[in-house]
């Protein structure tokens, strides 16, 4: 809790500095004005609530750094990563590796979380929007690094072995909450934000690490 207050205070300080001229209104006033305008411009619709626009201290700190056009302070970044690492929910049954075939379907699927969805259909991961994953799929984004050969280049031949434990745990944590390892990562916090279920995260990890997955062929 103490670190959360520290991050909030530092983020506020960054925003104030970003305001520039002393005679101008404080930057935080602009932030509040913008937030108020946005909230009054939207309404709840279907499963989507206006609260989806709310941001936590992690997002605020990263946004403040963007305003300044500088990397996040190293100490703040470390504190953010520690806070987010604590939110990672490890598999209840201890099983990290799921069905890579299902993982591929999730990676290809970009549906979900819109007002026209009923909330009953599982969300997609939309992973190909930012990553190359298999060589068969030629339509992919490049915002994130290529994940092709993800397990192979990390020497994972048996993802269920003790030797692979560290890589497997890291991969699970990265999918669950990427900001646990990179404070201002552009990658969605898929598990933490409820975009993907525990089972879906398991299948995505399987897609990335199973030697039989086309990712590692």
Over which residues does each language-model region extend?
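Extracytoplasmic electron-transfer domains, predominantly the class I c-type cytochrome c fold
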Residues: 33, 38-43, 98-102, 128-129, ...
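Post-cleavage N-terminal segment of exported redox proteins
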Residues: 2, 14-113, 174, 207-217
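Residue-level marker of regulatory loop/turn positions in helix-turn-helix DNA-binding domains and
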Residues: 95, 119, 139
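Bacterial N-terminal signal peptides that target proteins for export
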Residues: 1-9
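Generic anion/oxyanion-binding catalytic loop in active/binding sites
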Residues: 91-92, 116, 190-193
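Secretory-pathway/luminal and periplasmic proteins that interact with or process carbohydrate-rich
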Residues: 113-116, 136-140, 214-215
């Amino acid at each position: 809790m103490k670190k959360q207050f520290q991050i909030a205070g530092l983020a506020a300080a960054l925003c104030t500095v970003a305001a520039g001229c002393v005679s101008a209104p404080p930057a935080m006033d602009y932030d509040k004005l913008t937030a108020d305008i946005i909230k009054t411009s939207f309404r709840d619709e279907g499963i989507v609530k206006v609260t989806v626009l709310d941001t936590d201290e992690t997002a605020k700190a990263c946004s403040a750094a963007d305003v300044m056009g500088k990397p996040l302070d190293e100490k703040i970044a470390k504190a953010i990563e520690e806070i987010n690492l604590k939110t990672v929910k490890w598999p209840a049954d201890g099983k990290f590796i799921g069905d890579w075939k299902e993982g591929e379907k999730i990676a290809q699927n970009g549906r979900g979380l819109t007002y026209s969805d009923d909330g009953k259909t599982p969300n997609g991961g939309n992973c190909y929007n930012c990553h190359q994953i298999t060589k068969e799929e030629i339509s992919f984004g490049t915002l994130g690094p290529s994940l092709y050969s993800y397990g192979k280049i990390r020497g994972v031949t048996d993802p269920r072995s003790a030797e692979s434990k560290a890589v497997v745990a890291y991969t699970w944590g990265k999918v669950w909450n990427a900001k646990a390892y990179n404070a201002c990562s552009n990658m969605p916090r898929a598990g933490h934000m409820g975009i993907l279920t525990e089972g879906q995260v398991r299948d995505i990890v399987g897609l990335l690490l199973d030697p039989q997955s086309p990712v590692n062929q």
